[in-house]
């Protein structure tokens, strides 16, 4: 009999099979993947099952999950009881249990998989949400209790893992506050077992590795949050750090208090995947504050249906600055009685418009503008292959930001450099004696 020592924080997890779903999130080196491999091996020794191990890219299995299972099997002295096959990549147990390894980069191969009662999705944040839902459909067996294990390092709160297992602001769906998980470490919510871990939970980890993780705090706070703290958050550099959400009534009161408010409306066109986005803005030119107090956000809409839903603009005759790349749509809306013109577009306009919005000292958004909040509150810059920021590209396609760009087409926000330059200019007027 072999006695196997495990990290205390994982003891309950290794032997707990009460829930259908188990979601493990944690930092680097926390041993969540190791204990998941151990958990599955012990389960398959006890019961005849077929388990499916998934990663986004199949070729990453051999040096990660497959190697991890081989390590566990060797440590348990089971090399004669479990056969390792390289083609196809598979582990076969003496009692008929099997572990199969597949990648979501070749979904056709999943169609040949049957009677799967246990699925482990390693680095599940890398798998697409559609893939996750497809795997739920593959989890079926006529007799055995079904289980799905998801393990991941935390990424941004925009990732599907956070929206599915914790909260989705856009769909007003709340499951669990992630801060509660960080505090309690393990939580059962419905049919899901949650587990949080960090390097501190791995008693077999060298102290030098922990110090290396601690050092991230000085030069890479995003990676420190992920790797050392094991926590979700905003990933990357925010485009609009001055963006704040306020109650709608408060936003209206602030706008009413502006001595000379400037009102603007902008529209970005969409159809299938992209959205028709319209925003109403108010500018406080003295304070350089931007207020966003109304939105329209729909996709899969033809121009005639959109025009009907926006009929109030015909009555108010507000000027709408729209995406000039859609001249036919603009012409149609004009024929229906809308005051609509195309906003200027030119080489580099994306960057210039973004810089203009960034020059506002504060951006206040009504809590009724849910899609503006969803797109802009945590909007971050995209990066090139070398990790450098791309100043006019973002991690998502923010249609509401485009609408704001167009709304502000003919309005300029003075930046600090220009203001400072004006203040430093000498007064050319001769003093009166």
Swiss-Prot record:
Keywords: Viral genome packaging, Viral release from host cell. Functions as a terminase. Dimer of a small and a large subunit. It holds the Pfam family Terminase_3. The keyword Iron-sulfur does not apply. It comes from the Bacteria. This is PBSX phage terminase large subunit. To B.subtilis YqaT and phage SPP1 terminase large subunit. InterPro entries: P-loop_NTPase, Phage_terminase_lsu, Terminase_L_C, Terminase_L_N, Viral_DNA_packaging_terminase. The gene is xtmB.
């Amino acid at each position: 009999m072999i006695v196997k020592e495990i990290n205390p924080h994982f003891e309950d997890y290794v032997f707990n099979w009460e829930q259908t779903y188990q979601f493990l999130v944690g930092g680097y080196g926390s041993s969540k993947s190791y204990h998941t491999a151990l958990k599955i091996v012990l389960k398959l020794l006890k019961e005849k099952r077929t388990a499916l191990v998934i990663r986004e890219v199949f070729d990453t299995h051999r040096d990660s999950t497959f190697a991890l299972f081989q390590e566990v099997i060797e440590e348990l002295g089971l090399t004669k009881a479990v056969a390792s096959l390289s083609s196809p990549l598979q582990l076969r147990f003496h009692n008929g249990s099997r572990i199969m390894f597949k990648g979501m980069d070749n979904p056709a191969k999943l169609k040949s998989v049957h009677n799967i009662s246990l699925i482990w999705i390693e680095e599940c944040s890398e798998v697409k949400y559609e893939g996750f839902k497809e795997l739920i459909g593959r989890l079926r067996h006529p007799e055995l209790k079904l289980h799905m294990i998801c393990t991941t390092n935390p990424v941004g709160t925009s990732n599907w893992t956070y929206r599915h297992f914790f909260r989705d602001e856009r769909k007003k769906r709340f499951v669990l506050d992630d801060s509660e998980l960080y505090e309690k470490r393990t939580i059962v919510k419905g049919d899901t077992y949650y587990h949080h871990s960090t390097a501190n939970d791995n008693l077999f980890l060298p102290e030098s590795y922990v110090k290396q993780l601690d050092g991230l705090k000085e030069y890479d706070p995003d990676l420190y949050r992920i790797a050392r703290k094991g926590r979700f958050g905003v990933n990357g550099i925010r485009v609009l750090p001055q963006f704040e959400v306020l109650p709608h009534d408060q936003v209206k009161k602030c706008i009413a208090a502006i001595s000379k408010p400037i009102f603007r409306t902008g529209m970005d066109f969409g159809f299938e995947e992209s959205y028709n986005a319209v925003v109403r803005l108010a500018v406080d030119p003295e304070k350089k504050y931007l207020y966003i107090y109304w939105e329209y956000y729909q996709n899969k809409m033809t121009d005639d249906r959109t025009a009907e839903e926006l009929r109030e603009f015909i009555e108010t005759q507000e000027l709408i600055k729209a995406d000039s790349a859609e001249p036919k749509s603009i012409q149609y809306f004009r024929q229906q009685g809308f005051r609509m013109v195309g906003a200027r577009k030119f080489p580099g306009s994306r960057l210039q418009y973004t810089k203009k919005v960034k020059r506002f000292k504060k951006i206040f958004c009504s809590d009724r503008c849910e899609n503006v909040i969803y797109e802009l509150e945590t909007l971050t810059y995209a990066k090139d292959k070398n990790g450098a920021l791309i100043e006019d590209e973002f991690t998502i396609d923010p249609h509401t930001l485009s609408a704001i760009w167009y709304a502000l087409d003919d309005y300029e926000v003075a930046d600090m450099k220009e203001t400072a330059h004006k203040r430093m200019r000498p007064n050319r007027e001769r003093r009166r004696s």
